[in-house]
Amino acid sequence: MVTTYLLFIVAYLLGSIPFALVVGKIGYGIDIREHGSGNLGGTNTFRTLGKKAGFIVTIADILKGTLATSLPIIFALDIHPLWFGLAAVLGHVYPIFAKFRGGKAVATSAGVLLCYSPVVFAILAVVFFSLLFTTRYVSLSSMVTAVVAVIASIVSGDKIFIIAMCLLAGMVIYKHRANIGRIINKTEPKANFSKKQK
């Protein structure tokens, strides 16, 4: 039982590692929270620091979700891995290492899915990038993909999977509430695939 509690804390702490902040300060000498949207996530990193930093942060944020979800498997615990994944996402959104001001749950949630259901992860990746290249809205693509994740979990019939996806989708949409208003007002920034970045 003690091991379980400790690993839940480890999962939260893994999620709390603010890679966008670390990459910004160490690699570029800036606090990314003071630039762009101020968000500690991949999208703001791409827009503020460029492609290289954006890819590094996004991959790192995905992997921390994957690693956290793997903890009960690695330590042979009889507890559903998605609970540990949720702890990591909570850490990503409210990181203790960055004054509880984190990202929007997208990449780390993807990492959770990568560990728990690679097939669903692959399907959602196709959905996300199809929407992104069609609409050029990262926020809209993220929210719609989150809803599709819920639908996929319902189709699976796995009750814990359904609960976890509902919680993650709810968190993703909640963290994008400001984006929803900007999309409606047509002031939401679009991804610019032709723009040269660092």
From Swiss-Prot:
Topology in the lipid bilayer: Multi-pass membrane protein
Gene encoding the protein: plsY2
Enzyme Commission code(s) on record: 2.3.1.275
Protein task: Catalyzes the transfer of an acyl group from acyl-phosphate (acyl-PO(4)) to glycerol-3-phosphate (G3P) to form lysophosphatidic acid (LPA). This enzyme utilizes acyl-phosphate as fatty acyl donor, but not acyl-CoA or acyl-ACP.
Compartments where located: Cell membrane
Catalytic activity: an acyl phosphate + sn-glycerol 3-phosphate = a 1-acyl-sn-glycero-3-phosphate + phosphate
Family label: Belongs to the PlsY family.
Pathway(s) served: Lipid metabolism; phospholipid metabolism
Catalytic class of the enzyme: transferase
Protein name: Glycerol-3-phosphate acyltransferase 2
GO function term, MF aspect, one: acyl-phosphate glycerol-3-phosphate acyltransferase activity
Species annotation: Bacillus cereus (strain ATCC 10987 / NRS 248)
Keywords: Cell membrane, Lipid biosynthesis, Lipid metabolism, Membrane, Phospholipid biosynthesis, Phospholipid metabolism, Transferase, Transmembrane, Transmembrane helix
Pfam families: G3P_acyltransf
GO biological process terms on file: phospholipid biosynthetic process
Disulfide pattern: none
Transmembrane region(s): 4-24, 71-91, 113-133, 147-167
Complex and partners: Probably interacts with PlsX.
Listed GO CC annotations: plasma membrane
